[in-house]
């Protein structure tokens, strides 16, 4: 915002230099003021002889100040006259240009000409020549005249302005729908509230331009450069922005729904509250971009780079982020329900309270991710890498985590009811107080895991590895520990093992095939072990043979 004092001084200065008489009056006034100051100093000096030298210096200073003031005002007046003359010359050039183009329109039927016609070539040459000698206001007048004369149509313009320099042009609030400004230099242009829908702006330079609230819907901006441009609340719905450059651009509240941003560079761009619903962002670069509260639902962000992105509360529901890079991204409170994140890299991402309900995270890399309080219910997470991740208090009920790497993961108080963890690697994982009721942990590795106070009621731990696991206070009611590797000492620390089913493994013809959790690829179908009914005897709940009962022989009856 301009300082009011500076504005008043500038207005006073322009008023003075606009007339020689005002300049002379100002000089006279300054002379009087300086003379009064000198007389005051002289009076003081006469009373004190030690100030006599100062008195003489003041007397010498008076003419020097007057000469300097006169030179400054004269030079200012001369510059003002030059500016006035330049504006007058510019006005004459613009009027001459209008007359020349009007003549071509009326006598040479310029509107019906093609870009190769002599009249069109003459109009283009005349236009490019005059644009070099005009100010931003004059250039704006030329563009408006060409558009209103139907010479800048988006399809095939009669006057082609490619490579024309329109830097700083003033076109705010101008109606120019369907204009062709392809490959034009519009750096620093003032285009606020401009109407340019369905326009051709391919490879146009718009760096640092002001496009606030501009309407560019359905426009073609492939390869356009908008570095540092202001597009707050701009309408870019359905626009083609492939390989466009938006580095450091301001897109707060912009409407980019259904826009094509494939390969675009949005590094460090501010997209707070922007609408990107259904947009195409394949291979786009969004490094360190700000996406807080933005709507990116149903967007295609396949293989895009979102490293370090800030997207608090952003709506990614139904979006395709397959193969995307989100290393170090901050997605706290983000909504990713039903999103596709297969093979995505979310290492070191922060996703507190994020909603990933029904999300597809198959094969994703999420090492060291922070997902405290997240919702991963019914999520598909086969072969996901969550080593060292913090999932405290997460809802993973019915999630598919088969062959997932959860080593050293923190899952304290997590809800994993009926979750599929077959073949999962949970070595040294923290599962204190976790809910694993009905969870499938067949072939899972739980060595050194902390399952203290965990609820494993009706969980399936067939062929699981529980060596050195901490089961202190764990509820193992109706748990299936068939062929599980667990010591009696470990089980003795559990809260309840009264109904643990652990048949004698000697009755299996062969050990079941269990895939090692670190093995890549899908989990093959394990061989179903064949269980032979023993000829005699039975086992108790903890697998200790009971006393054999002799078969009753009818002939032995008395």
Where does each model-flagged region fall?
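Tandem repeat scaffolds
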Residues: 152-558
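Charged/polar helix/coil "stalk" or linker segments at domain boundaries
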Residues: 49, 53, 68-205, 210, ...
């Amino acid at each position: 915002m301009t300082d009011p004092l500076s504005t008043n001084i500038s207005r006073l200065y322009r008023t003075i230099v606009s007339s020689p008489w005002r300049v002379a009056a100002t000089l006279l006034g300054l002379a009087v003021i300086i003379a009064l100051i000198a007389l005051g100093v002289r009076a003081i000096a006469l009373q004190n002889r030690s100030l006599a030298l100062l008195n003489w210096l003041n007397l010498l200073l008076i003419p020097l100040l007057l000469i300097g003031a006169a030179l400054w005002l004269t030079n200012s007046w001369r510059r003002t006259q030059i500016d006035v003359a330049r504006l007058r010359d510019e006005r004459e050039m613009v009027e001459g240009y209008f007359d020349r183009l009007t003549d071509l329109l009326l006598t040479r039927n310029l509107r019906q000409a093609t870009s190769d016609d002599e009249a069109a070539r003459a109009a283009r040459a005349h236009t490019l020549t005059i644009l070099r000698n005009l100010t931003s206001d004059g250039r704006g007048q030329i563009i408006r005249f060409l558009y209103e004369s139907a010479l800048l149509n988006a399809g095939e313009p009669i006057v082609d302005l490619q490579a024309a320099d329109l830097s700083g042009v003033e076109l705010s609030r101008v109606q120019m729908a369907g204009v062709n400004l392809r490959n034009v230099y519009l750096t620093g242009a003032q285009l606020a509230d401009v109407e340019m829908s369905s326009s051709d702006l391919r490879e146009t330079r718009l760096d640092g331009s002001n496009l606030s609230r501009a309407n560019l819907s359905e426009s073609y901006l492939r390869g356009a450069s908008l570095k540092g441009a202001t597009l707050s609340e701009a309408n870019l719905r359905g626009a083609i922005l492939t390989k466009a450059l938006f580095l450091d651009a301001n897109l707060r509240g912009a409407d980019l729904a259904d826009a094509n941003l494939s390969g675009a560079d949005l590094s460090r761009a501010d997209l707070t509250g922007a609408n990107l619903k259904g947009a195409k962002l394949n291979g786009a670069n969004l490094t360190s971009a700000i996406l807080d509260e933005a709507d990116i639902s149903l967007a295609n962000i396949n293989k895009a780079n979102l490293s370090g992105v800030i997207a608090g509360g952003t709506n990614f529901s139904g979006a395709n982020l397959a193969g995307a890079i989100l290393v170090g991204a901050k997605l706290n409170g983000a909504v990713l329900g039903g999103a596709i994140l297969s093979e995505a890299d979310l290492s070191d991402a922060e996703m507190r309270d994020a909603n990933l309900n029904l999300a597809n995270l198959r094969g994703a890399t999420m090492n060291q991710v922070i997902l405290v309080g997240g919702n991963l219910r019914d999520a598909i997470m086969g072969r996901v890498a969550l080593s060292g991740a913090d999932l405290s208090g997460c809802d993973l009920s019915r999630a598919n985590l088969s062959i997932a790497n959860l080593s050293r993961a923190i899952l304290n108080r997590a809800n994993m009811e009926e979750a599929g963890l077959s073949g999962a690697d949970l070595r040294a994982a923290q599962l204190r107080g976790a809910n694993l009721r009905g969870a499938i942990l067949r072939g899972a590795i739980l060595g050194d895991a902390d399952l203290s106070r965990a609820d494993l009621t009706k969980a399936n731990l067939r062929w699981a590895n529980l060596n050195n696991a901490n089961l202190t206070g764990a509820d193992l009611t109706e748990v299936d520990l068939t062929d599980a590797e667990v010591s009696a000492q470990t089980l003795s620390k559990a809260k309840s093992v009264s109904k643990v089913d652990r048949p004698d493994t000697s009755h299996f013809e062969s050990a079941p095939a269990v895939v090692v959790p670190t093995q890549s690829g899908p989990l093959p179908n394990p061989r179903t072990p064949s269980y032979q009914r023993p000829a005699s005897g039975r086992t108790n709940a903890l697998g200790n043979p009971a006393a054999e009962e002799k078969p009753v022989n009818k002939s032995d009856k008395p």
